[in-house]
């Protein structure tokens, strides 16, 4: 029953997420008609989705709380501990909110997520404008399930910097390997300088980030109601 319940709920949230993307991005004003659609979907799933009311409890709330936040930010590069603390006031209230067609938790978390997306664009644009300090040895833990959320926005920005530095280093190595292969084929081939490789690597990382957030923006602006 728990698996079935979880599946139903995830499907519900995917549908509601689709609708809410349009609601949150098209206008900052509350739209009563769109709110009615959200509430109708929630009510339908609760009344027609064969939920076991006994399982709509604090355990269920905690599961939804953890899974929803983890799905939005699996690499912990958007939310901080401050955000999670604010979200936590709803940790054991989601079951009651669903029964009452209340989307306060969803609106808070998803609205904050959209704000963080905007911040992320500023982060990578600023970080990738100039070369990294490659003489400085740094450590980054990419076990996202094990690491904790950043304590502050400053700490989060540093986490972004380390990730982008690592991506840039990987691309530099790829380009160095390509040059080495060309040199083996033709020893008259002139290998590119480190500064040239570094500049191209940062540009490639920037392009990857731009493409990623273009796709995210398209999702945010898509007219979900036309497919509802």
Where are these regions (language model features)?
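Flexible, low-complexity junctional segments that flank or bridge functional domains
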Residues: 2, 20-227
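Bacterial N-terminal signal peptides
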Residues: 9-18
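Bacterial N-terminal signal peptides that target proteins for export
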Residues: 1-9
